[in-house]
Amino acid sequence: AILAAVALPAYQTYTKKAAFSEVIAATGSAKTAVEVCAQTVAGAASSGAGSFAAECIQNKNGVPANTTAAATNNYIGVVTAASGAGVTVTATTATGVKSPLAASESFQLNGTRQTNGQVTWTKTCNPSDMC
C-alpha cells in the first residue's frame, strides 16, 4: 500500500509529461518554417512591411496555416502569430479522449530575429512544471 501511494503519483506525472512532449513536438514544423523564412525572406526591419513579424507568420512564406485542436491532430492546435517585433508559435491542448492533459495546457516559443537572420527562441510552458 505504501509503495502504491508513492509510485502512482510518480507514474501519473511521468505519463502527463510524456503526453506533453507531443504538444512540444507539435510546434516543430512551424518553428522550422519560421526559421527558414527569417533566413530567406524577412528583412532586418523591426516592424512594418518586410519585417520578421509581418512576413514569418501563418499562411505566409512557407509558414503553415494555424490548426485547431481536433481528433485528427491529437487534440493539439498550433498558432503562429506576430508578437511585437517577434513571432510566437503556440501549441495548445483541448480535452481529448484518453489524454492525461487538461484543456488549454500550452507550449509557447517566442522567436526573435537577430541581425544575422538567426532566430533565437525562448519557451514558456503552462503548466510550468511540464518544461
Place the predicted regions along the sequence by residue:
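Amphipathic alpha-helical segments typified by the pilin-like N-terminal helix
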Residues: A1-C37
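Periplasmic/extracellular, small/polar-rich flexible segments of pilin-like filament-forming proteins
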Residues: A38-C131
